[in-house]
Amino acid sequence: MLHVSTIEGQLDAKGLKFALVAGRFNDFITERLVGGAVDYLVRHGGDRADLTIVRVPGAFEIPLAAKKLAASGKYHGIICLGAVIRGSTPHFDFVASECAKGLAHVMLDANVPVGFGVLTVDNLEQAIERAGSKAGNKGVEAASAVLEMVRVLEQI
């Protein structure tokens, strides 16, 4: 049998600092995502004093705040949360796409894990389902992914 070295991240937030960037647009959804992410990090050993929440107008502004936070060197990971709900115009497509691309650039340019917890949904029902209802809480999932990546990168 061939032995292969495996690197995996442990889900332990103790001693780590995280920034959460939350869009205020659709805040009745976003606040559920923030609550889920904060609860997850605390349950996994994080300290509320090591969490910073930055509020921005909406999803389009999230990448700029994330970029500034990543460049500060103060945070081990950044968790980005928001909700873009499709309307009757193409605006949804532009905002969702540019937010995702912007966050990918931040992560790759800064070498800091960035979680994409920005919901891109067709309607309010889907948003509610993904903010702590039937489909779980995507804020929790984004926090988990960032935590795991922080711990993976420590080993590479």
Curated annotation (Swiss-Prot):
Positions in coiled-coil regions: none
Organism from which the protein derives: Solidesulfovibrio magneticus (strain ATCC 700980 / DSM 13731 / RS-1)
Name used for this protein in its record: 6,7-dimethyl-8-ribityllumazine synthase
The family this protein is said to belong to: Belongs to the DMRL synthase family.
Ligand binding ((2S)-2-hydroxy-3-oxobutyl phosphate): S88, T89, R130
InterPro entries noted in UniProt: LS (IPR034964), LS/RS (IPR002180), LS/RS_sf (IPR036467)
Gene: ribH
SUPFAM superfamilies: Lumazine synthase
Pathway membership, UniProt: Cofactor biosynthesis; riboflavin biosynthesis; riboflavin from 2-hydroxy-3-oxobutyl phosphate and 5-amino-6-(D-ribitylamino)uracil: step 1/2
Molecular functions (GO terms): 6,7-dimethyl-8-ribityllumazine synthase activity
EC category name: transferase
HAMAP family xref list: Lumazine_synth (MF_00178)
Leader sequence segment: none
Catalytic activity entry: (2S)-2-hydroxy-3-oxobutyl phosphate + 5-amino-6-(D-ribitylamino)uracil = 6,7-dimethyl-8-(1-D-ribityl)lumazine + phosphate + 2 H2O + H(+)
